[in-house]
């Protein structure tokens, strides 16, 4: 089971990724984790990536693709893998095809922007304990105060509406073409299977739809 999971920040990808990896016994691979692991292991590619990152540069697609090939050749990928947040761009997707990396499924978890803004911008955090509340879905007993200590709750900088909308616009500009790329690939080559899943409703309902798409 070789899967790409697409979805905007706040669409609930993390929950579904955890379910898929546990259900099929496959690792979740994100480029960030992969880069850190390669750097830590001191592989030739890892050292190359480190020198680029140390000088403040962006790791090239070529290097990323080679790291991906190195990563998916490891023993834990024998039953497949789940790419999380990769590929991000058309050149990366094209390079994957060119490198002969086979994929079975591309699953997009789609949630309306306004729903995502409400989900994320409503989060409030008690910094000392890490307890998370939501102004609509899980409000504290007293607005703006932690239930246990009574201390102030804060909104993280990443959770402000302005930041969320910016991240969404970046996601759409990068990912919309990717969706079309994989739809086209599925239509012309029959693989990978592309599935569009509405990410609203209970976790169980969405998980059921994901499972159906992967079967």
Curated annotation (Swiss-Prot):
What role does this protein play? Catalyzes the reversible transfer of the terminal phosphate group between ATP and AMP. Plays an important role in cellular energy homeostasis and in adenine nucleotide metabolism.
- What gene does the UniProt entry assign to this protein? adk
For this protein, what is the EC number? 2.7.4.3
Task: Tell me which UniProt keywords the record has, alphabetically.
Answer: ATP-binding, Cytoplasm, Kinase, Nucleotide biosynthesis, Nucleotide-binding, Transferase
Q: Recite the lineage of the species.
A: Bacteria, Pseudomonadati, Pseudomonadota, Gammaproteobacteria, Pseudomonadales
Q: Which GO terms describe its cellular component?
A: cytoplasm
Source organism of this protein record = Pseudomonas fluorescens (strain ATCC BAA-477 / NRRL B-23932 / Pf-5)
Give binding positions for AMP.
Answer: 31, 36, 57-59, 85-88, 92, 156, 167
| Positions of the UniProt region annotated as LID | 122-159
Q: Where is this region: NMP?
A: 30-59
Disulfide pairings: none
Q: What is known of its domains?
A: Consists of three domains, a large central CORE domain and two small peripheral domains, NMPbind and LID, which undergo movements during catalysis. The LID domain closes over the site of phosphoryl transfer upon ATP binding. Assembling and dissambling the active center during each catalytic cycle provides an effective means to prevent ATP hydrolysis.
Tell me which Gene Ontology terms the entry assigns under biological process: AMP salvage
**Name used for this protein in its record:** Adenylate kinase
Report the GO molecular function annotations: adenylate kinase activity; ATP binding
Pfam families, alphabetically?
Answer: ADK, ADK_lid
């Amino acid at each position: 089971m070789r899967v790409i999971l697409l979805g905007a920040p706040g669409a609930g990808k993390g929950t579904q990724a955890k379910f898929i990896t546990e259900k099929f016994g496959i690792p979740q691979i994100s480029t960030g984790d992969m880069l850190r692991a390669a750097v830590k292991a001191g592989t030739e590619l890892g050292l190359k990536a480190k020198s680029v990152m140390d000088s403040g540069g962006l790791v090239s697609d070529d290097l990323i693709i080679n790291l991906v090939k190195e990563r998916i050749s490891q023993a834990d990928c024998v039953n497949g893998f789940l790419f999380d947040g990769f590929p991000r761009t058309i050149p990366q997707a094209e390079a994957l095809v060119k490198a002969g990396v086979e994929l079975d499924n591309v699953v997009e978890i789609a949630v309306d922007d306004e729903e995502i803004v409400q989900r994320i911008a409503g989060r409030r955090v008690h910094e000392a304990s890490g307890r998370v509340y939501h102004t609509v879905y899980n409000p504290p007993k007293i607005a703006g105060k932690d239930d246990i200590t009574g201390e102030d709750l804060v909104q993280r900088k990443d959770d402000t509406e302005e930041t969320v909308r910016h991240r969404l616009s970046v996601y759409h500009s990068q990912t919309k073409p990717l969706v079309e790329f994989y739809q086209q690939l599925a239509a012309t080559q029959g693989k990978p299977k592309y599935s569009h899943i509405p990410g609203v409703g209970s976790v169980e309902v969405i998980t059921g739809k994901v499972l159906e798409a992967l079967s």
